[in-house]
Amino acid sequence: MEFILSVVGSLLLVICVLVSVAFLTLLERKVLGYIQIRKGPNKVGLMGIPQPFCDAIKLFTKEQTYPLLSNYLSYYISPIFSLFLSLIVWMCMPFFVKLYSFNLGGLFFLCCTSLGVYTVMVAGWSSNSNYALLGGLRAVAQTISYEVSLALIGFKILLFSLL
């Protein structure tokens, strides 16, 4: 019974995160509309609330294109794996009801966020383009340099919370 509740809680968390991201993009588009002195996406439905769902339908019905010489499977699996990793990170966050509580949650967070950058490199490599590969390697180098400072800040917070 506890396993079923944790699975239902995890699915509910993932759905809430995805819907909140959709409405944050709606908020971003409205703010950009006000900044640029134009009408934002508030023409669909009541105050533009159905706009994220219309955007999702549009994205799912678009034609899929891929580079001619690319490695098709890894080219399309890497963004899916990146989304999966970013949703898994939410599972270790401490909420009111603990979904998955374990002692090394901070280390799990750092590991999942560090794995996310390699999906960009795999996507660049699988496109068989030198420029995409260089972009992927540049993203890996940049993210690794930021992860060191993130880990040091996290360990500093952990150290001061134990004192």
From Swiss-Prot:
Major location category of this protein: mitochondrion
GO annotation terms (biological process): aerobic respiration
Topology in the lipid bilayer: Multi-pass membrane protein
A molecular function (GO) term: NADH dehydrogenase (ubiquinone) activity
Pfam families tied to this protein: NADHdh
Compartments in which it is found: Mitochondrion inner membrane
UniProt catalytic activity: a ubiquinone + NADH + 5 H(+)(in) = a ubiquinol + NAD(+) + 4 H(+)(out)
Transmembrane segments: 3-23, 77-97, 104-124, 143-163
Keyword Nucleotide-binding among UniProt keywords: no
UniProt-listed Enzyme Commission number(s): 7.1.1.2
Keyword match Protease: no
GO cellular component: mitochondrial inner membrane
Keywords: Electron transport, Membrane, Mitochondrion, Mitochondrion inner membrane, NAD, Respiratory chain, Translocase, Transmembrane, Transmembrane helix, Transport, Ubiquinone
Function: Core subunit of the mitochondrial membrane respiratory chain NADH dehydrogenase (Complex I) that is believed to belong to the minimal assembly required for catalysis. Complex I functions in the transfer of electrons from NADH to the respiratory chain. The immediate electron acceptor for the enzyme is believed to be ubiquinone.
PANTHER family the record matches: NADH DEHYDROGENASE SUBUNIT 1 (PTHR11432), NADH-UBIQUINONE OXIDOREDUCTASE CHAIN 1 (PTHR11432:SF3)
Family indicated by similarity: Belongs to the complex I subunit 1 family.
Protein name: NADH-ubiquinone oxidoreductase chain 1
Organism expressing this protein natively: Drosophila bifasciata
Lineage, highest ranks first: Eukaryota, Metazoa, Ecdysozoa, Arthropoda, Hexapoda
The encoding gene: mt:ND1
